[in-house]
A protein has these predicted regions:
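GHKL-family ATPase ATP-binding module
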Residues: 1-24, 31, 53-55, 63-65, ...
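C-terminal interaction appendages of subunits in large macromolecular complexes
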Residues: 397-416, 431-437, 447, 451-453, ...
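Conserved short strand/loop->alpha-helix "switch" segment adjacent to the catalytic nucleotide/phosphoryl-transfer site
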Residues: 36-55
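Short adenine-binding "F-helix/F-box" segment of the Bergerat
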Residues: 97-98, 105
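A short glycine-centered beta->alpha linker in the GHKL/HATPase_c
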Residues: 91-96
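Short Gly/aromatic-enriched secondary-structure transition segments
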Residues: 98-99, 453
Length: 652
């Protein structure tokens, strides 16, 4: 639903100088201590850091695309889990870098903070999370080979653990039309805890990058299986297609995506948005293709523009009565999926991790462009404006009802136990770091759980009624649900804008359900609630899933507990099946107090799974929760059929 106006290529202003030689490479500091402290440069040496190496090299290629010189990027996972990233950009410069007295290619791969993005003429805008790129990948790789096609010649150079192993060499010629860079590297097993790349993790990030870089084609190839696996991401519609993708499984309230684009304050702004029938807002913000999960000035500008523009239109067109209050930003954003993407020459971020944009001009630019173009859109599309207004008014009424219920909850003090749910068996300690709460499904397990707990540090909250599916409910229904009210009050943090992590009463929230399909469904309902209204609990590592055993094997008066069919078979092999008495637990209620305490509750002997969430995963998580908990049956069926092969024990 783009706004019609004269065609103009706004990207032209942001394309860099065509001069891209050694003099455009600036050196800010030497490559030091990367191998000693890799976490400082790539976040961690876990599987997350492993994948970050790929992103660093890909981001360099994307910078070429943003500058207008690259159309294709191919990422290949080889059989040995080495990676090749190839682009058709200008090719990294190979001539002499005067200050360093060595080739620019060597400088890029051996000097930290060396690259065309720091001088201003090589790149107008660039991404890359830490701006360290190629040199850090080189330092953390057991080998790295780079091939450059440039000016009719092919050059190669090789490295190992940051050191040159083969000097730059011209190995042949290419046509003038052939150009680009190919980087092949193998992460160093001495550095990384994991060495195996996950296709789906790379797929999610590369798809996002393709959405954000209109017309860039990114191909992901996996050579590790007998049958080659390939996926290509190419989106002519850019972020408009991103919004449609994120709205999969939801009912859009109007057919086309609203799109605003323009340039102001030397900042290129793109915004795409569409309302759906859900009750949560999903807004994702990016600066030079970098995800800014904490928002910042570009998000503030958008929210200001949306709220003021919509209220002004609603007043002028009598969609709101004079006696009615203005719609709040939250009301207007209910069910909104939105992508905000800005391109800035020298973005200022708050904090080291670039999670929040601080550039003040971005607020002015986004606010101005969205205000002007959204006003025009609403005037041209009164039917869509009416649909948006009706949804916002419904949200306003629901929020008012929810506020009354919330105020009742707020008046009760969690500190002295007043107002805590009557069914909560609380612990005596007030030290939140030592305390944990078990959310227990059903009455049958409640007795053993209460008796088997440590009453000093372990609380038990039973779920007796049905947990509301919050994916399909407004705030007023959420506050009216007894089970959810009980959890909100017991946890102590509040939800949404009231959330305060410092008031958390238990540092471990443990969801304890039966190990069957019904138990998994109840656990998913609870996780859906926490994810939507208290996501910080997951981000900060406070949410866990208990792992009750499936089997109790007794032989020679000794008990063995198996938590999976595979473990059950291994135990039988080890102790011998003859004379072994096997019982399968169908639910928590079938265990006696001692069994439940030993296998599922005692910190010394239990197994817990911590629920993790990375900010990079949020868009995919939103889609997964919508698929599993939304109204549409067909996407859910497709998801289960597609993922059933990854499930070892499918209880149907």
């Amino acid at each position: 639903m783009a706004i019609e106006r004269e065609e103009q290529d706004l990207n032209e202003q942001f394309h860099a100088s065509k001069e891209y030689g050694a003099d455009q490479i600036q050196i800010l500091e030497g490559l030091e201590a990367v191998r000693k402290r890799p976490g400082m440069y790539i976040g961690s040496t876990s599987v997350r850091g492993l994948h970050h190496l790929v992103y660093e090299i890909v981001d360099n290629s994307v910078d070429e695309a943003l500058a207008g010189f690259c159309d294709n990027i191919t990422v290949t996972i080889h059989k040995d889990n080495s990676i090749t990233v190839e682009d058709d950009g200008r090719g990294i410069p190979v001539d002499l870098q005067k200050k360093a007295g060595k080739s620019a290619l060597e400088v890029v791969f051996t000097v930290l903070h060396a690259g065309g993005k720091f001088g201003g003429s090589g790149y107008k805008v660039s991404g890359g999370l830490h701006g360290v790129g190629a040199s850090v990948v080189n330092a953390l790789s057991s080998f790295l080979d780079v091939t450059v096609c440039k000016d009719g010649k092919v050059y190669t150079m090789s490295f190992s653990k940051g050191k040159v192993t083969k000097e730059i060499e011209c190995i042949g010629t290419c046509t003038e039309e052939e150009h680009g860079t190919k980087v092949h590297f193998l992460p160093d097993a001495e550095i990384f805890e994991e060495s195996i790349y996950d296709f789906d993790t790379l797929k999610v990030r590369l798809r996002e990058t393709a959405f954000l870089t209109k017309n860039l084609r990114i191909k992901l190839v996996d050579e590790r299986e007998e049958e080659l696996r390939e996926m290509t991401f190419h989106y002519e519609g850019g972020i408009k297609e991103f919004v449609r993708y994120l709205n999969k499984g939801k009912e859009a309230l109007y057919p086309d995506v609203i799109y605003c684009e323009g340039e102001k304050e030397h900042i290129l702004v793109e915004v795409a948005m569409q309302h759906n029938d859900s009750y949560t807002e999903n807004i994702y913000t990016f600066v030079n293709n970098i995800n800014t999960p904490e928002g910042g000035t570009h998000l503030t500008g958008f929210k200001n523009a949306l709220t003021k523009t919509f209220n002004d239109y609603a007043r002028q067109n009598k969609l709101l009565k004079d006696s009615e209050p203005n719609l709040s930003g939250e009301d207007i954003r209910e069910g909104l999926t939105c992508i905000i993407s800005v391109k800035i020459e020298d973005p200022q971020f708050e904090g080291q991790t670039k999670q929040k944009l601080g550039t003040s001009e971005a607020q002015i630019a986004v606010q101005g462009i969205v205000s002007e173009q959204l006003t025009y859109f609403l005037e041209q599309n009164p039917a869509v404006a009416r649909v948006m207004c009706e949804k916002s008014i419904m949200a306003q009424r629901a929020r008012a009802a929810a506020r009354k219920a919330r105020d009742l909850t707020r008046r009760k003090s969690a500190l002295d136990g007043v107002g805590l749910p009557g069914k909560l068996a609380d612990c005596s300690s007030k030290d939140a770091e030592r305390c944990e709460i078990f959310i227990v499904e059903g009455d049958s397990a409640l007795g053993p759980a209460k008796e088997g707990r440590n009453p000093e540090t372990q609380a038990v909250l039973p779920l007796r009624g049905k947990v509301l599916n919050v994916q399909k409910a407004r705030l007023d229904r959420i506050y009216a649900n007894e089970e959810i009210k009980g959890m909100i009050t017991a946890f102590g943090t509040g939800i949404n804008e009231d959330f305060d992590l410092s008031k958390l009463r238990y540092h471990k929230i443990i969801i304890m359900t039966d190990a069957d399909v019904d138990g998994a469904h109840i656990a998913t309902l609870m996780l859906t609630f926490i994810y939507n209204f208290m996501p910080e609990l997951i981000k900060e590592g406070h949410v866990y899933l208990a792992q009750p055993p499936l089997f109790n094997i007794t032989k020679n008066k000794k008990h063995y507990y198996a938590y999976s069919d595979e473990e059950y078979q291994n135990i039988l092999k080890e102790i011998g099946a003859e004379g072994a008495d096997v019982s399968r637990f169908k639910g928590l209620g079938e265990m006696d107090t001692e069994e439940l305490a030993e296998t599922t509750m005692d910190p010394e002997t239990r197994t817990l799974l911590r629920v993790n969430m990375e900010e990079d995963d949020k868009a995919e998580l939103d889609i997964t929760f919508t698929t599993l908990m939304g109204d549409q049956v067909e996407p859910r069926r497709e998801f289960i059929e597609k993922n059933a092969r990854y499930v070892k024990n499918l209880d149907v």
